[in-house]
């Protein structure tokens, strides 16, 4: 007689084993209709799985995040159902849930077209609208293998042979005549899977290995209701308009080319933004009392072996040989900073020692993962390392956290999600070291009243880390900042200081990045602002235009004056109509467009309008320059009169 305890503390007693669906029905028919699955003693279970002992139960509906993930996973099965009806010869590989949706990798000789995807989506919807029940059957390993062998599903057989123990009892989910294998849970009925859209098709190697066959990957998105689906599709349309690759080309900020995959060619205006970010971070480094250093781009393999990178990170490192020595181009800056720390005797009085670098790093990312500025092979990190004592860890980590929040606020990012990544399988150091490091970061977060979630196994190989994920105007998540605690690397590389009792001690090392990759952060900013950078970041802050040739000399004088004031300004003296010039520079997203005619020249004024078409009227040249200088100095996010 299981006693079921619900989240509100109430209890319900049943004479026989019950399913989550039974409990939901006992509470009310409305809840039963909405029930997707159950969380039984903290573990997600199918709505029809029987509960045989006293348990805590939370009923999962489409209002829960887990409910939406489950229906997305079931939509992947629905996609498989439809594909097998339309192309029975298809061999199904894997169909997991991803952010906002799902995909299925399929082996099909016929290359899917846009028209095929539209037809496939219609077939999926027609199937879902029959509201058929999804039937789960738990079978033996051999029964599962026989089922897929009879259907010629070689990829499912490979998964069973290579990934699932023969003692296991896999779950097969029956979608009418279609069968799929999964840990689950899945929806009990396809009425939950009617708000979806197939998005695209791409190539994907089986198991992500380029030595294997290239499959077709069909992507889809799925939501709890029509409104949520529509909102997401509108957001995607807006994201496409803001695509940094498109805007970067329109504004002539940078380019990339096949001869240097994953490497950025910065053009003048893009490099201007890069330098402004560097300048801003340098000011922050001064406020928080950092040294700035510069380490070599390439170091001997021996050093990377001592640091542990060669063993744990070699596949991501570019290497070269010279005079019978093997070198690695640095993927990160930390080993170099330890070498700088090791020069000269350090005392406890020298700690904390905060060392920062705009470090040029390279990582051998897979070519298929490269994506504009967001995923590159060559990048610049606003990297820093703090060498301190155990007693200083809490204060130093707290200062790093405050620096992250101060910096993000300047760009208008105030929705920050914090995650704590803990020890991975491949790591250096013993469990005691990892316990101390993880506990120290947890305490620092608690001291700053910061809510966080734990990401088990996602830490760096040398230490746990706090990850700061900012959410942009489209509510997309971008993981940028990190604060990592490291007891291992200083030991491996022989870093020591003289303690107060004259003993030699190993410092604790805090790894800290705020923007992360400057290249990636610029990509994020391009999309956040849709190319309309705040004045302080804008490559060109002011453009001055004449109406006739009579004002040309005065316009050049104005631009010279602005440049002397530290304002990035240019002139447009072309023999074009003023409306044409205004439109062109509006498309270039220049914050301020200044027009000079005879009257403005006579009165030493400028007619000012913003890139958004707001007419600020006529202003004295000195007054306007003072306003702009203040905007730049304050790093204001808004233009005048906004």
Swiss-Prot record:
GO MF annotation terms: ATP binding; metal ion binding; threonine-tRNA ligase activity; tRNA binding
Record GO biological process: threonyl-tRNA aminoacylation
The keyword Lyase appears for this protein: no
Protein residues bound to Zn(2+): 334, 385, 511
Similarity comment: Belongs to the class-II aminoacyl-tRNA synthetase family.
NCBIfam families: thrS
Designated name of the protein: Threonine--tRNA ligase
Lineage summary: Bacteria, Pseudomonadati, Pseudomonadota, Gammaproteobacteria, Alteromonadales
